[in-house]
């Protein structure tokens, strides 16, 4: 389960760090008391929130959509806490993440360069368990998103790190299909299947769990024959 207390949807007001923690604490307590057998990821770009979630409630992962850019203490906090860290690609700041950036020479090279720099810093600080999230829908045009989905596996291979794919209910899906986020299940499942067939989706971040599990089961059943 991925749990967050700071919405990043367009038009949302950014809460303070204290407000974010106040929102999270009741849910974290419920998880710790009733569901702690289920791994929990906390979605935050703030080091103090990450520290609270891990030290006070035992959260298992930190999912940082800012890739350490919003809080210069995040990387050292993650290294000290010793939990897996989801490092997402975001060009610029969180407040401007819905604006499209320009990538030269191309988006996959820019994303690789970004991850090389960030991973090097994390490793120097002692962080070991790093997961890469290419950041679909964040500071990218529709063309960037689809090009990156097609090429990220090959582009990020030199880093030899797990890749998380998060396209569930994203604008890149429902806008193209002229539907809505709530109606994007079919399109999301298609993209999940493509990502799985490419062999680069180690983790899928999803809203519709059953459909994603079915896609995984079908691809895994077919996988032995893909190289024949």
Regions found by a protein language model. Name each.
Residues 1-5:
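N-terminal glycine-rich anion-binding loops that anchor highly charged ligand groups
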Residues 8-34, 38-41, 45-48, 55-124, ...:
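Active-site-adjacent loop and "lid" segments of alpha/beta metabolic enzymes
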Residues 136:
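Active-site metal-binding loops of divalent metal-dependent hydrolases
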């Amino acid at each position: 389960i991925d749990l967050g207390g700071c919405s990043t949807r367009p038009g949302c007001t950014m809460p303070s760090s204290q407000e974010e923690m106040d929102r999270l604490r009741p849910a974290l307590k419920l998880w710790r008391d009733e569901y702690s057998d289920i791994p929990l990821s906390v979605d935050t770009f703030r080091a103090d929130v990450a520290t609270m979630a891990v030290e006070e409630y035992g959260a298992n992962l930190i999912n940082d959509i800012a890739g350490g850019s919003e809080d210069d203490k995040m990387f050292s906090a993650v290294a000290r806490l010793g939990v897996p860290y989801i490092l997402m690609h975001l060009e610029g700041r969180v407040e401007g993440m819905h604006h499209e950036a320009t990538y030269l020479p191309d988006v996959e090279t820019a994303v690789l360069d970004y991850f090389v720099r960030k991973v090097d810093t994390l490793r120097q600080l002692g962080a070991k368990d790093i997961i890469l999230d290419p950041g679909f829908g964040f500071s990218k045009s529709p063309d960037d998103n689809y090009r990156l989905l097609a090429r990220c596996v090959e582009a990020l291979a030199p880093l030899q790190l797990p890749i998380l794919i998060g396209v569930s209910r994203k604008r890149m899906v429902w806008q193209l299909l002229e539907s809505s986020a709530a109606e994007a299940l079919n399109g999301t499942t298609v993209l999940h299947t493509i990502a799985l067939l490419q062999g680069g989706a180690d983790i899928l971040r999803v809203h519709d769990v059953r459909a994603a599990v079915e896609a995984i089961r079908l691809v895994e059943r077919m996988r032995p024959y893909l190289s024949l």
